[in-house]
Every structure is written in structure tokens, then in C-alpha cells.
Amino acid sequence: MLEGCILADFRQSKTDRPQSSSNGSSSLNGSVPGAPNRVSFAKLREPLEVPGLLDVQIDSFEWLIGAPRWREAAIARGDAEPKGGLEEVLDELSPIEDFSGSMSLSFSDPRFDEVKAPVDECKDKDMTYAAPLFVTAEFINNNTGEIKSQTVFMGDFPMMTEKGTFIINGTERVVVSQLVRSPGVYFDETIDKSTEKTLHSVKVIPSRGAWLEFDVDKRDTVGVRIDRKRRQPVTVLLKALGWTNEQITERFGFSEIMMSTLEKDNTAGTDEALLDIYRKLRPGEPPTKESAQTLLENLFFKEKRYDLARVGRYKVNKKLGLHAGEPITSSTLTEEDVVATIEYLVRLHEGQPTMTVPGGIEVPVETDDIDHFGNRRLRTVGELIQNQIRVGMSRMERVVRERMTTQDVEAITPQTLINIRPVVAAIKEFFGTSQLSQFMDQNNPLSGLTHKRRLSALGPGGLSRERAGLEVRDVHPSHYGRMCPIETPEGPNIGLIGSLSVYARVNPFGFIETPYRKVVDGVVTDEIHYLTADEEDRHVVAQANSPIDDKGRFAEARVLVRRKAGEVEYVPSSEVDYMDVSPRQMVSVATAMIPFLEHDDANRALMGANMQRQAVPLVRSEAPLVGTGMELRAAIDAGDVVVAEKSGVIEEVSADYITVMADDGTRHTYRMRKFERSNHGTCANQSPIVDAGDRVEAGQVIADGPCTENGEMALGKNLLVAIMPWEGHNYEDAIILSNRLVEEDVLTSIHIEEHEIDARDTKLGAEEITRDIPNVSDEVLADLDERGIVRIGAEVRDGDILVGKVTPKGETELTPEERLLRAIFGEKAREVRDTSLKVPHGESGKVIGIRVFSREDDDELPAGVNELVRVYVAQKRKISDGDKLAGRHGNKGVIGKILPQEDMPFLPDGTPVDIILNTHGVPRRMNIGQILETHLGWVAKSGWNIDGNPEWAVNLPEELRHAQPNQIVSTPVFDGAKEEELAGMLSCTLPNRDGEVMVDGDGKAVLFDGRSGEPFPYPVTVGYMYIMKLHHLVDDKIHARSTGPYSMITQQPLGGKAQFGGQRFGEMECWAMQAYGAAYTLQELLTIKSDDTVGRVKVYEAIVKGENIPEPGIPESFKVLLKELQSLCLNVEVLSSDGAAIELREGEDEDLERAAANLGINLSRNESASVEDLA
């Protein structure tokens, strides 16, 4: 995108790191051709590959648009006539009839044309990546039988990119899946506070429509609430549905409470019951039998007003045992549903364990757990957009009905009836403003991938932070294998936002399923069944690491299993139904990338998972020495690496593109992204990892992206770490770094900022982008070209002009001389002011790209804009004091000191360590994983050789017996290197070039003080830890101001870096000044340094002229206080010490105006001033 990039493309040399090998031992890497040879400590064979990590997004959108791939999958699943989401909406809407029923309009066959522009062009030109949607509309005149059919354009429909994102107005966005309570019937149990009786209630919750609630109160009567209105006896509703007293007695005669309710019910028959319900629902309106009948029918039995949705119908049938085995057709309530719900409630209250339904089926009678994943479902992207289209279509329906009545019947065509504006507006509103359509997190590939797999309980129709209690936020046994128990935010959203587990998938009803291996008669098979949380509760499940023999039988007679509600016990192997497919089944992608997760406290693991998403792409990426085997799949599915689509031979390679000659004779060119800006200002750059003539297979990674190396996720650096205190400089999580990391750009990152300016038409004339700027020296204009735009490659710092622009000034009455000049020189003498785009305060860098859009070149620009210029400035940020670093175990800290390399502690062979962490950061935080990672990192870096067959190495595979230095390893979560294996390998490491082993078998080494050369008194843990540089950079936080913008009302400086604000001297700081008796300092702080508007200009003048500081005046906030008191009708006057009234002058002082004019400054800038004007 950015032409003329002058940044060096740092590519790692092939000798630097181990090269690709097609036979990686990790179960994950082995399935990808050309995967790096990462040897794995995994002991378990996984029968199932990790599914596509973006399927939750892509499959859902394919359902919405009815894509061919989705149709094939649906037919294979057994759906006779699969319907896409758009088709469903059109079928619901059709036909739209006029009020008399003489005309109707129906819609069918939604289809898309080609997308208007490719993804890159949409990002570049602020366009939406969308395809035109067409439907077939059919108008039928029922009086004449005339049919008119037309293809109607329904607006541009945003399309999903291959990466599962949307491009809306040039920015990449993600639609987050929403966790909501499923429609259905829910039984609850509460204890009455006064009588301590157990009360029961039931809610019938639809997808759309009125709620129906039944309950048994403390007087043992059964009541009903319709649409949250007043409670009335349940028999009133039954009578309104046409039941007689005899029928009620016959069905519910077994229940005393139903009989007592019937006795207390004083309505005589169906008509009275209907009128009674009508009075409760519509108080104040005159009731009639017909209106009451219509109201009840509309509330629950008409599809237009009431919709349980397929999932609600499925849940009701399942709970009440109705229509077993029948296909789901209706989505409204039925009389049978209401009666069965009441019977279930009554039997629940009477403590009966089961209920026999009319079909002879027995269903268990029990209350529901609302937080169970059998009762919570996902609204994925397709359903969220479908709901929004439904809203737009219903608005359009009203317009169509009105037009049917007003237009001439002969002239009506579908096109004249349809107004697509409400539909287009509804879709735009959803993508632009919905809480679930979010600006994509593009800090690094992992953060983007995690964002697409996020599950949110917030949003429209969901929970709110304030109302959500502890239960809904807590980890639930049914989350196992569905939602990660670790990865969730730390703040007010904790537990409300989660992440999909690695193997989880979403079924057609929106429930999350997780896979299990079928166990038959104690033999574990490779047959995979996906189970929802409800189905899993009915089975006995063994964990993935249960020992099994060669024939697949459980090695032990009794197996550790879990049953319903997460109860854990030992049972005979013959009772086991299923077994987990993988130990990492319960965690998310980010959590699965934490090695030795099983040794970390959950709170710290949560921080580790979250902080990996904040890692900044470094200039040189480096894959971890100690990984988990998840790095490759995560990087490929994140979509930031380039993958070969077909097998073939590399024909040509350059920094910008790779050409592959496929085996089928076709040629494919892959373009690299070069130094593009991500949504978060980090640098997205791709570079080839293949050479011309190399053979590549389909699915092989041929170019690395940001934060990847050899196709694996590489978020940080492997650094030599010593865990020890050092002169107190690493107290309280501070970190000491070696200057080598600064000098050799080890932790250097590139950040790209985008600066934009447009030239508009104003009331006084058009703005102009030009080099001809008033009152600016040639030095300032040196880097601008003839158009007034900065040249590529220019070094700029804050205040420098990036794009010159002048805006016409408001004209005053012209003098005769000015009129003469205007007559002679024409427009040239017009007054203009400098409104150029300048580098904001505190920023600097190198200009790496410029984009110019102009109306003259037929570029699409907003109304009133003639020209738009974007300038991209790249900044190379070396690591510095105040930057935040973190490991993968929640071990984070701020750099407290950067020491010269020669002062760092060093190993006996003279190797200085890179980073010193404090020992106190480990014990109380209980993240021991970082210590084990450090030890294994040293083993991997040094290489190892295991002689003989020691007891601890019995279970190690052959490839782990010996390895050369720099061997990358993986230790999968819950199936990684054991403590005794680690201890054994530490004593088998290869010696260095002098034949010495630096680190002992306990993982410690004798370190020497770099300043004195003396050894430290105790051995120190030394090894390699994977350290990430986080997005919290000191350069973004440090801020200084002398003068700047002030608040309009109080005239006090604004606050915060973004507003170029000042430092607040608050109430407690004033007390400190009072305590020290610093009266003059305090007076200065409260007046001339704050909001004494006249005083601050006079002080500025005195400083410039070298005079003494004048007396302060009256602060503006005091005048505001007076005005507030006067607004309360209090007459407040300011008196001098001798009782004379002091007049507070309004407006600006004459002295102020004179001084400001003489100095050529404007110190009373208000908050409307932009930061650019301050430089």
C-alpha cells in the first residue's frame, strides 16, 4: 500500500534459526506441510485435528447468505430443504397484503452480484466491502389475478472477508457472537422469606412476543401472569382457552392445589374468563368477547406477534416431552404446551420425580439452572445481522401497505411499492453503532483471532454490567470444552466476556458443542461425537489423560470421570460413555499458548492469556524456544501469513510478491503487505520465507506476517534471564534490561501513525492545499513538494508541517488602498489563515507513504470535500525505561533501569544476561510455570543428549533423546514436560565451546557481578524466558505542557494527554502547600497558573520583558461561583477590606487585549482549539 517504503525489511537469515522440516513431531505441526521441526513432550495421541478457528464466524455468515458450501453441509447433516438466513426473513415477510386483502407482495430468491471493489481498495478509499443484493418481488392483484414479477435491488450488503471480518467505511470490524438465554420454558425454585415454604414458578420465554409466567404462591394457589401484568388464577387462562371445569378436574384432579385454585376462581365460563383477562391486560378499555378472543390469540398463537423460534420450540418439546421425534414446524405456543407446562409445575411443587406425557413418554421433573450452557445459546454473526434485517424489513412492510392503498392499482409494480431505505439504514446502523460490531483488535495476529472467537453476554437483548450478578459471571461445569475458564477481562466485564474453547463448535440451534471419543464396553474408539451441554449431562466422561493400553482399553480398573454438574468420581471402566479428545479441550487459543499452564495460578494465567494479545510486533520476530504446539495453527488461521493455495514450485520471489507455478500449470501471484498500519498503529509487514525454485505444498506458509516466524506465532523474544534481586532496582516488579537489547534492536518495534487533512468548500470560499503559506519561513517548507505535501522519506518531529493548507478568513470592510490592491492583483490579496496539518505534540518519525484523493481524479469523497490527503509517519521505537514487558504467565513489569552490557551479571564463560527479574515476583503469585519455562528454555537453547535409559526418560519419544542447540520444543497444556523430565534434561545439556556446562542440574549457575567481577554469594536461576513487549509504551504516555487549551467556562486548563491538558493541582495538594505555609506559591498556582485570564497574559508579558511578576487578579472559577449563587437568587457582592464594593469587570481587560496584541500571542485559547493549532 505504501509506496516508497524506505524502512529496511529485516529478514532473519536461514542459518539463524532451525529450518522447516515436513515431519514435525507435534500432532499439530505434523498436519501442515513445511512446518518447523518443533519436538513435542506430548504423551497422548490426539484423534482429532483442531477445527478451523474462524469457523464460528465464516459458517454463520455462509448460513445467512445461503452459500453453496453451507447448503452442501446442511444436506449432508440431513436437512431436507435447507434455508439460508435471508431466505427465512423473506419467507416470514411474504406475503405483504393490503388492509382489504385484495393485493399482495411476496419476496423470494435472494442473490448477490460481484463485490464492488476488492478488500485492499475498500481499505484504501474508505469504502464498504459489499455486494449488491437482489431479490425477486412478485405483486399479485387478487381481484384480477394479475401477477407482476420484478428483480428488485435491496441495497449493498456488507460481505465477510476471508479472515472473518467486515470492512465498513475503510475500517476493519468484527461482529462478536452474543451469549443469550435461549427461548424456552424455565422452572425455578425459591424460598418464601416469611413462611419458609418452597415456591415454584415457570417462565415461557419466546424469541419475540409476550412472556407467560405461572407460579405457585405461599397460599398454595396456582397463578398466571400474562405479559408481566397482574396475577390471576391459572384456571382463568384454561377456561379462556375453552376448557370446562370438568375437563380441568379430569386432567388436574390429582392435584390439591389445582382444585383449590379452581374453587377460588369465580369466573363461570369461557366468555367471562376472556373478559377477565382482557380487563387485566387492557384496563380502561371496554371489553367485548371478540376483542378479548383476538387479543389472546394475537398474544400467543399468531406467528406475526409471537415467535418461539426453532430453538425455543426445540427446547419446549425437549423439556415437556412433546412431539418427540417429529420435525419442528410451528414456532408459536399451542394449547398443549400451556397445559403440559402447568402440569409440570404442579408435579414439581408436589415433589414428583417424573411426569408421563400423553404420548406415554416419561420426562424427569426438575428445576432449571439458568447459567447452564444447555440454556444459554450463541447468537452468531449471521443471526445478529438477520435480526437487524428483520427490523428493517418490518419497517419497509408498513411503507408497502400504505403505498398499496394510495397508489393506482393499474400502475403498481413491485418497484413502486418497495422503499429499500429502511432496510439499508438498519444494516448500516448495526455495523456502525451496535455494541456487538467492534473495531477489530489488530495489535497482533493473536489479538485479531481471539476477537473473532469472543463470546459476549453484553449487548442488545443481553445482560448489562450493572445488573449481572456473581452467578452468571462464574465458571460453570457446563463451560467445559465450550468456553475457556481462564480467558476473560479483569475489569467490570469479568465473566461476561469469554472466549470459545479450541475444539468447540456451534450447532444449528446456536448451542455450543464439544467433541468426545465414544467408549464402547470399556474400549476407547476414534469415533467422534459432538455433544451439547444438555446431552453431556446424561453421560459419564473420562478425561483425555486416562491411561489406555495398545488395544484402546482403560489400563486401570477404575477410571476418574465426571458426571452431571461436574461431580468427579472413580467408576468401573465399563460405565464410561465418552472420553475427552484432547487435554487442551477446555481452554481457548490464547490460553493454549501458555506452556506449563498447569503450574500457574488461574488469576495469573488469565493475565498471561490477556497480555499475549497486547504484544507489539517487533522488527525481528522470534518464535518461542518453548512453545505449546498451538503456535502454527493460530498463526495460519489468524490470516496474517501467506499460505500457498496449490502445490507447485516457486517461480519468482521479491519483497513485494511471490509467484508460484502450480502443478496444474496455473500461475498464482501472492502480494505481500508492506509496512501497512493496523487498526492499533502497529506495523503489518509480510516477508517471504521461501526462495525461487523451492517446492511448496498446498497449505504451506510461504511468507511470514507480523509476529510470526516460519509460519509460527512469535509474539516476543527468547531472552537470557537471571532471577535475582539487583541493588533494589528491580523492586516491586521493576525489570532491569541489558543495553544490548537497545543497541541491537532486539525489542524494537515500528509504529505507524496516519494523519489526515481535507480541503473543503467554506462559506468564504474553498480551502486550498498549497505550499504558499503565510508567515512561514523557507526552512519550515524545505521538505514540502510543489503541491505543499511533505516528501516521502522526510524526518519530521512535532510541529512540522505535513500538508500545507490555507483557509479564507472572514473579510472586514476594506480600506480604499486594499480595494485598489484587490482590483490590481485580483484574488491574490485575499486574507487567508494557515490551517496546515502539523505533526501532533510529542510525535516524530519518518514519512513512509502519502495518499492523495481528489474530486478531479473522480475519487469518491464526502460532500463538500474537494481534496483529501493522508500522510503515514513511521516511528522506530527502541525499548526504553518505562516500557512494559511481560511473560506468558502473567509475570509483568515496567523497565526500571537499562544497564550497560558490561555492568550486567555474567555467566562463568563471560556471557552477560539480558534481563534480571526479581525473585519476589514468583512465590506469592504462584505462577511457577515461568520458572519451568526458564529451565526448559535453557535446555532447548543449549541442546541435550540423554545417555542410557534413565527412569525419568522412559516415556520420552525417540526424537527427545538428543538435540542440537537452538532446538525448538513444545510442551502442550496439561500434557507437557514433567518436573522429573525437566530435572533430568537439565543435567544432560550439551557443554559450550570450552567444554563447560554453565548451568547445573538444579537449573542454577554461579553469576558474576559485571561491575566488580566478584561472584554473587548464591547460585542464581538462569535460563531463557519468552518475553513480550506490550502496547503500553512510555512514549505514548509521557506528556508535558506550558500553555495550551483552556475550558470555556472555568478557563482552567483541560486534562489529559489527548486534550493537550495540564497537570491538576487538586484539593489535597493545596493542603500540602498550606501545611508548609507556602502562601505565595499557592496563590500563584490557584490564579496565574490556572484560571486568572488577565493575570496569565500579564505574567507572560512580564517574563518576556524581564520585569517582576505582577499581582494576581481574580480567578475565573470565582466568577463562575458568583454566577451560580446569583442563579439561586442570592445577591452576592465582593467587598474590599474597608467595605467598598469591588466591581468584577466582565469580558476581557483592555490591558489583556493590549498585551496580547503586542506579544502576538493568544493565551486564552478555548477548548475548541485543536491540538494541531498549539504546536
From Swiss-Prot:
Principal EC category: transferase
Enzyme Commission number(s) from the entry: 2.7.7.6
Catalysed reactions, as listed in the record: RNA(n) + a ribonucleoside 5'-triphosphate = RNA(n+1) + diphosphate
Gene Ontology cellular-component annotations: DNA-directed RNA polymerase complex
Gene3D superfamilies attached to this UniProt entry: 2.40.50.100, 2.40.50.150, 3.90.1100.10, DNA-directed RNA polymerase, beta subunit, external 1 domain (2.30.150.10), DNA-directed RNA polymerase, subunit 2, domain 6 (2.40.270.10), RNA polymerase alpha subunit dimerisation domain (3.90.1800.10), RNA polymerase Rpb2, domain 2 (3.90.1110.10)
Residue spans of biased composition, Low complexity class: 20-31
Disordered as annotated region, ranges: 12-33
GO molecular function: DNA binding; DNA-directed RNA polymerase activity; ribonucleoside binding
Family annotation (PROSITE patterns): RNA_POL_BETA
Keywords, in A-Z order: DNA-directed RNA polymerase, Nucleotidyltransferase, Transcription, Transferase
Protein role: DNA-dependent RNA polymerase catalyzes the transcription of DNA into RNA using the four ribonucleoside triphosphates as substrates.
Oligomer and partners: The RNAP catalytic core consists of 2 alpha, 1 beta, 1 beta' and 1 omega subunit. When a sigma factor is associated with the core the holoenzyme is formed, which can initiate transcription.
UniProt similarity note: Belongs to the RNA polymerase beta chain family.
The protein, known as: DNA-directed RNA polymerase subunit beta
Biological source species: Mycolicibacterium paratuberculosis (strain ATCC BAA-968 / K-10)
Gene designation per UniProt: rpoB
